[in-house]
């Protein structure tokens, strides 16, 4: 995987400016800046202000993180503080490991 060729589109659904929402956003931004700097788009959706968006996307709990692109769509509900859990849940860690394995094998 060449990260430079992919753009990751993510949506974070939160319920207002609660401590859980603030923590989820801060943690997610840290992960994205460390791992995907410059190649991601993050839209934060407050389900209290935009309940129709939550309904359209079938969001039942917050915080919910949804990876829209690249396919397939993946969702993580709840605590986002575990970096590895977030990356695995969104199929992003698997892509990193696959690329590292491929590069290691091709350099032999």
Swiss-Prot record:
The KaiABC complex composition changes during the circadian cycle to control KaiC phosphorylation. Complexes KaiC(6), KaiA(2-4):KaiC(6), KaiB(6):KaiC(6) and KaiC(6):KaiB(6):KaiA(12) are among the most important forms, many form cooperatively. Undergoes a major conformational rearrangment; in the free state forms homotetramers as a dimer of dimers. When bound to the CI domain of KaiC switches to a monomeric thioredoxin-fold (KaiB(fs)). KaiB(fs) binds CikA, leading it to dephosphorylate phospho-RpaA. CDD domains: KaiB_like. Key component of the KaiABC oscillator complex, which constitutes the main circadian regulator in cyanobacteria. Complex composition changes during the circadian cycle to control KaiC phosphorylation. KaiA stimulates KaiC autophosphorylation, while KaiB sequesters KaiA, leading to KaiC autodephosphorylation. Phospho-Ser-431 KaiC accumulation triggers binding of KaiB to form the KaiB(6):KaiC(6) complex, leading to changes in output regulators CikA and SasA. KaiB switches to a thioredoxin-like fold (KaiB(fs)) when bound to KaiC. The keyword Zinc-finger does not apply. NCBIfam families: circ_KaiB, PRK09301.1. GO terms for biological process: circadian rhythm. Keywords: Biological rhythms. Belongs to the KaiB family. PANTHER family: CIRCADIAN CLOCK PROTEIN KAIB2, KAIB-LIKE PROTEIN 1. Has 2 forms, fold switches to a thioredoxin-like fold (KaiB(fs)) when bound to KaiC. InterPro entries: Circ_KaiB (IPR013474), KaiB-like (IPR039022), KaiB_domain (IPR011649), Thioredoxin-like_sf (IPR036249). Pfam families: KaiB. Coiled coil: none annotated. This is Circadian clock oscillator protein KaiB.
